[in-house]
Amino acid sequence: MNYRVVNPVKVESGPSTGVANGQPPRPMDGLADGGPPPFLTKTYDMVDDPTTDAVVSWSATNNSFVVWDPHLFGNVLLPRYFKHNNFSSFVRQLNTYGFRKVDPDKWEFANEGFLRGQKHLLKSIKRRKPPNSSPSQQSLGSFLEVGHFGYEGEIDQLKRDKHLLMAEVVKLRQEQQNTKSDLQAMEQKLQGTEQKQQHMMAFLSRVMHNPEFIRQLFSQSEMRKELEEFVSKKRRRRIDQGPELDSMGTGSSPEQVSQVMFEPHDPVDSLFNGVPSDLESSSVEANGGKAQQDVASSSSEHGKIKPSNGELNEDFWEDLLHEGGLDEDTRNPAIDDMNLLSQKMGYLNSSSTKSPQ
């Protein structure tokens, strides 16, 4: 029986394989290189699609992409490419592949291997292996990853603003306390001024009801000027010296000169400033020796009353108002009011100006 070979096997001559040489087989070049992950490929196609530029597109530098409308991105594009609509999950996936957020105020992400027109570089992007951790830690880590994309910067900015506001509040409180203390001091001064004004008006009201006293007070001005001119020409003599003869040939003792020595002041100023005046001098001229004796007796009785450095305190005004310094119901209103007012204000200076014996 003859057998013919229908399909002969062609034996090719060539280099011996590794099996013949006893070496293990190796894969062909390029078979081991896998493509980029589907997540990166879909993301690249979604960003590179010009029809979705209103929602997501490349940045001006072409090395990052920007999600312009996160709401439409999650509701329209994510279900079309990834079968879900969770934008936070998409951000976490980007974080696992090493994407970083460029601008904290925008949803802009970048990676060294994610460039426009260079899709072959996606193979260089590797997924980071998550560390072994419990599920609770993994969920917490996902929130922290999302926080890296802008929330930490916002939190730091809010903290700085809070510190600035607290410092401003403390400063305003200090200014408020200072202003409050100043207002209290001003109120106290105002109350004191009002009290002095009330005392002054009450005193003036009583004085104006006694016209005789006012007339006598102003009638002394001419007499005062003459006495001041006379006293200015005189010189004080010591006690041990003898009496000096004046131009009329009469002698005058130091006691007589001391009775007319006084401080030159206006009658009205003396009334309100408490400066001792010479009402007793006018009384001597008007009433003679009897008035001089009355002045001497009244000065001896009230010798302890002294003016308080030319100032009228509140006690003086109260004593004057309560004790009736100017009483129109007395027997002789003009003389009595003038004497009592002189005693209160320390106008009688005959006893204080006498030379020591």
UniProtKB/Swiss-Prot annotation:
Transcriptional activator expressed upon environmental stress that specifically binds DNA of heat shock promoter elements (HSE). Involved in heat stress response. A motif (Bipartite nuclear localization signal) lies at residues 223-238. Exhibits temperature-dependent phosphorylation. GO terms for cellular component: cytoplasm; nucleus. Residues 150-202 form a coiled coil. InterPro entries: HSF_DNA-bd, WH-like_DNA-bd_sf, WH_DNA-bd_sf. PANTHER family: HEAT SHOCK TRANSCRIPTION FACTOR, HEAT STRESS TRANSCRIPTION FACTOR A-2E. Residues 319-331 have a biased composition (Basic and acidic residues). Homotrimer. Residues 158-208 are annotated as: Hydrophobic repeat HR-A/B. Residues 231-357 are annotated as: Disordered. A motif (Nuclear export signal) lies at residues 341-348. GO terms for molecular function: DNA-binding transcription factor activity; sequence-specific DNA binding. The keyword Methyltransferase does not apply. A motif (AHA) lies at residues 314-323. Its main location: cytoplasm. Belongs to the HSF family. Class A subfamily. Keywords: Activator, Coiled coil, Cytoplasm, DNA-binding, Nucleus, Phosphoprotein, Stress response, Transcription, Transcription regulation. The hydrophobic-rich region (HR-A/B) corresponds to the oligomerization domain. AHA motifs are transcriptional activator elements. It is found in: Cytoplasm; Nucleus. It holds the Pfam family HSF_DNA-bind. PROSITE patterns: HSF_DOMAIN (PS00434). This is Heat stress transcription factor A-2e. Residues 249-259, 348-357 have a biased composition (Polar residues).
